Swiss-Prot record:
Annotated pathway: Protein modification; protein ubiquitination
Gene it is expressed from: Fbxo32
Gene Ontology CC: cytoplasm; nucleus; SCF ubiquitin ligase complex; ubiquitin ligase complex; Z disc
A GO molecular-function descriptor: ubiquitin-protein transferase activity
Superkingdom of the source species: Eukaryota
Coiled coil: none
Function: Substrate recognition component of a SCF (SKP1-CUL1-F-box protein) E3 ubiquitin-protein ligase complex which mediates the ubiquitination and subsequent proteasomal degradation of target proteins. Probably recognizes and binds to phosphorylated target proteins during skeletal muscle atrophy. Recognizes TERF1.
Full protein name: F-box only protein 32
Family annotation (SUPFAM superfamilies): F-box domain
Tissue: Specifically expressed in cardiac and skeletal muscle.
Length: 350
């Protein structure tokens, strides 16, 4: 059988694109297409330069994307939560998808929803950061940056955000040290950059100086004692009572009121928990202040928020409380169940 093809060990042929079409490129000994050699080299240089420009543009775009503040999510008031595949709908809703689609960026501007979002960010930073997608992690950092900027501007909730940043930094340190053993979305350099960003935010909060208001009007010390006690009873954190007592000598006496700390203990903890942590003072009376800080270290405090996320049991739609959603139930309000931040995370554990 004759061998029709070329030797498989040959280097092959070289072709050059000309005005008349593609033609085979020959060496100088053959005397053909020698004039096309320079144009061929020029085209090779042009091709290499184009590749270099494309690579440079890609690197520039990657750098801009890593620093951009744009959030890749849909600002919706409600989402449908489905946990399994059906004939009509395939797939399921994840925590990262819900975090991207719900409008948390606007929620932090609402004082009634601010504490809820901050608590949710803290829980995600503590244990659920690696379960988020790359876009969800980027959205998480963008929302956290907005929270920090809001605190720096308003000079409120400073301690709350400090604790959030400390939790995030501890989690990032653990994840970076365990690289290769745990699933990390993205380059390790991006995680190190997030650690540096978190440290920078902590330094900004530590260096903040609360400015006095420009106007001079009534202060809390100018109010009657009964109103001062009424204001203190509205505080749900014992550390706020201690800080308020350090602001003025008159307030320090009120902040040590036994009845005030007793009500605070009864608000956060059950009677059974209180009976297990009884502490007596030198006078033989219950020291409710010491009992409170002892109970805080042993049991979680009661969480109460102005506005929470709610889940409709009838149509499985997740939305903010007070917002309407398309529901076929006769009384949608009776089908809605409020979700705490931990309940929101547990909703996506399969």
């Amino acid at each position: 059988m004759p061998f029709l093809g070329q030797d498989w060990r040959s280097p092959g042929q070289s072709w050059v694109k000309t005005a008349d079409g593609w033609k085979r490129f020959l060496d100088e000994k053959s005397g053909t297409f020698v004039s096309d050699l320079s144009s061929y080299c020029n085209k090779e240089n042009l091709f290499n330069s184009l590749n270099y420009d494309v690579a440079a543009k890609k690197r520039k775009k990657d750098i801009q994307n890593s620093k951009t503040k744009t959030q890749y999510f849909h600002q919706e008031k409600w989402i449908y939560v489905h946990k399994g595949s059906t004939k009509e709908r395939h797939g399921y809703c994840t925590l990262g998808e819900a975090f991207n689609r719900l409008d948390f960026s606007t929620a932090i501007l609402d004082s009634r929803r601010f504490n809820y979002v901050v608590r949710l960010l803290e829980l995600i930073a503590k244990s659920q950061l690696t379960s988020l997608s790359g876009i969800a992690q980027k959205n998480f950092m963008n929302i956290l940056e907005k929270v920090v900027l809001k605190v720096l501007e308003d000079q409120q909730n400073i301690r709350l955000i400090r604790e959030l940043l400390q939790t995030l930094y501890t989690s990032l340190c653990t994840l970076v040290q365990r690289v290769g053993k745990s699933v990390l979305v993205g380059n390790i350099n991006m995680w190190v950059y997030r650690m540096e960003t978190t440290l920078h935010w902590q330094q900004q909060l530590n260096s903040i100086q609360i400015s006095r208001p420009a106007f001079k009007g009534l202060t809390i010390t100018d109010l009657p004692v009964c109103l001062q006690l009424n204001i203190m009873q509205r505080l749900s954190d014992g550390r706020d009572l201690v800080s308020l007592g350090q602001a003025a000598p008159d307030l320090h006496v009120l902040s040590e009121d036994r009845l005030l700390w007793k009500r605070l203990c009864q608000y956060h903890f059950s009677e059974r928990q209180i009976r297990k942590r009884l502490i007596l003072s030198d006078k033989g009376q219950l020291d409710w202040k010491k009992m409170y800080f002892k109970l805080v270290r042993c049991y979680p405090r009661r969480e109460q928020y102005g506005v929470t996320l709610q889940l409709c049991k009838h149509c499985h739609i997740l939305s903010w409380k007070g917002t309407d959603h398309p529901c076929t139930a006769n009384n949608p309000e009776s089908c809605s169940v409020s979700l705490s931040p931990q309940d929101f995370i547990n909703l996506f554990k399969f």
